A protein has these predicted regions:
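Conserved anion-binding
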Residues: 7-99, 103-104, 175
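Thr-Gly-centered strand-to-loop micro-motif
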Residues: 16-17, 72, 129-130, 153-154
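Alpha-helix-loop-beta-strand connector modules within alpha/beta enzyme cores
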Residues: 26-45, 108-135, 174-176
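Short Gly/Pro-enriched loop/turn and capping motifs at secondary-structure junctions
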Residues: 103-105, 133-136, 157-158
């Protein structure tokens, strides 16, 4: 109901995370009412090194892991594989994925390129990368190494380390399309 009210109030899009996990059919219901382009599924993901079970397993730094979906602002694990989840959300009507790496969020060490690449390659809807941007080069890196549609950054702007305009100029200088 809350998402419906937000869209009826004039918002272009609404992002849903915990609500989608608890009631996945809400994605289809909202999509049918407002259109796919309005429905963003926010997916908070953390690497899980307990690889028991049927998960998409990856190896990094000599360790095996899978990408697990978290809810309640990244505080509660779900046991849901992020790759399978994003595919399901697309099939239910999501128009976009807002992908946040819990592991990288707040570190200012760059985006989780492996996670972003895997999610982008598993869906055909736009993916927005989030979590970890500490400098303009991190944004350039995620655009060049993945087919991500957009990149979200907070810390570099909150602490006025870089201006939005300067970051956009640097992105454009690196051959990445951006609105100036």
């Amino acid at each position: 109901q809350h998402a419906r009210d937000i869209l009826l109030s004039g918002a272009d899009k609404v992002a849903i995370n915990t609500g989608a996990v608890k009631n996945p059919k809400i994605i289809t219901e909202l999509m049918e009412l407002f259109g796919r382009q309005c429905i963003v599924v926010a997916v908070d993901v953390k690497r899980n090194y307990n690889v028991a079970g049927q998960k998409n397993v990856f190896t990094g730094n000599g360790k095996k892991f899978w990408f697990e979906v978290f809810i309640y602002g990244g505080k509660k694990e779900t046991g849901i594989d992020a790759i399978e989840w994003t595919k399901k959300m697309e099939s239910l009507g999501a128009g976009e994925i807002l992908l946040t790496s819990i592991d990288m969020d707040g570190t200012k060490d760059g985006y989780d390129i492996d996670l972003t690449r895997e999610i982008v390659n598993s869906v055909s809807i736009p993916v927005v990368a989030s979590g970890g941007c500490g400098k303009p080069e991190d944004m350039i890196d995620v655009f060049k190494k993945t087919d991500v549609e957009a990149a979200l950054a907070a810390s570099i702007f909150h602490y006025e380390t870089h201006s939005v305009n300067r970051v956009k100029e640097l992105i454009k200088e690196n051959g990445i399309p951006v609105r100036i």
